[in-house]
Design a protein with these regions (language model features):
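Structural beta-sheet core signal
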Residues: 24, 52-54, 119-120, 195
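Active-site metal-binding motif and surrounding structural segment of the metallo-beta-lactamase
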Residues: 1-53, 149
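Cap/insert and terminal regions of metallo-dependent hydrolase folds
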Residues: 117, 125-227
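Core dinuclear metal-dependent hydrolase active-site scaffold
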Residues: 1-16, 78-140, 144, 225-231
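Short glycine-/acidic-enriched loop or helix-start segments at secondary-structure transitions
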Residues: 5-8, 35-37, 63-64, 130-131, ...
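A short, active-site helix/loop in glycosyltransferases that binds the activated sugar's phosphate group
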Residues: 56-67
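Divalent metal-coordination and catalytic microenvironments
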Residues: 6, 28, 52, 92, ...
Length: 231
């Protein structure tokens, strides 16, 4: 749950056993990304006036589900760069991406620090649609255009057919296999790419698996719980 995740964050940052974030940013409204925010409310953490940044459609869904009470809601517009709180030391930019938008639209978030920047892209449908939307020819071209040093990208599934008899077109994500095919080996000047958001069926969750070893041999990484990135 949220309390466990905040405990992991606090320990990773040397902040004790728990923390309340200075601000919250949301990419979209699918179940695993928003339902936990209710725990910021009076029944659990007792939060009030926490700055929240999301698109207008995400904020609308939160209000309809009565999840917005603990927050001071701020609409983030795609392409605008802003500081979430005064003196926080970093800026954010929301970047529109296509992803099963039945409830709200979906954004990646670029985090811009004093020395480095990071792209947070946990969910999108496929690279073809995303690259067309942002007007770039390849993943590398897109990352170069943003000047990012790190990219935490959608690694939900390793390959097609991973869900057994379930129709995977109903839960579209670019597979890690497809992403690696498009990227090939890491080249000089490439950002550090870290695959995140792995489903429990993904064999790359096992660091000793042949899949995880192959990914590492190309120069890419799988995200690790509690890791930190200095920007």
């Amino acid at each position: 749950g949220l309390a466990h995740q905040l405990s992991i964050a606090a320990k990773s940052l040397g902040k004790g056993d728990s923390l309340v974030p200075d601000s919250v940013s949301l990419t979209h409204c699918h179940l695993g990304h928003v339902d936990g925010v209710g725990q910021f409310g009076k029944e659990a953490m007792g939060g009030s006036g926490i700055p929240l940044f999301a698109s207008s459609s995400v904020i609308q869904v939160l209000e309809e589900r009565r999840l917005a009470t603990p927050f001071q809601n701020n609409v983030a517009h795609s392409g605008n760069v802003f500081s979430p709180t005064v003196g926080c030391g970093f800026e954010l930019e929301f970047v529109r991406v296509p992803h099963r938008d039945e409830y709200s639209d979906t954004h990646a978030i670029r985090v811009i620090g004093p020395n480095h920047s990071l792209l947070f892209l946990p969910d999108h449908d496929d690279w073809g649609q995303t690259l067309r939307l942002v007007g770039e020819q390849s993943i590398r071209d897109w990352f170069i255009s943003m000047g990012i040093d790190f990219a935490m990208i959608d690694g939900t599934f390793w390959s097609d057919g991973e869900l057994g008899g379930r129709d995977m077109t109903r839960v579209p994500h670019p597979t890690i296999s497809e992403s690696m095919e498009l990227l090939g080996e890491r080249r000089e000047g490439d950002p550090e790419i870290i695959f995140i958001h792995l489903n429990h069926t993904n064999p790359a969750l096992d660091g000793d698996s042949s899949q995880a070893r192959y990914l590492s041999s190309l120069g890419w990484k799988i995200g690790e719980q509690g890791s930190t990135i200095l920007l």
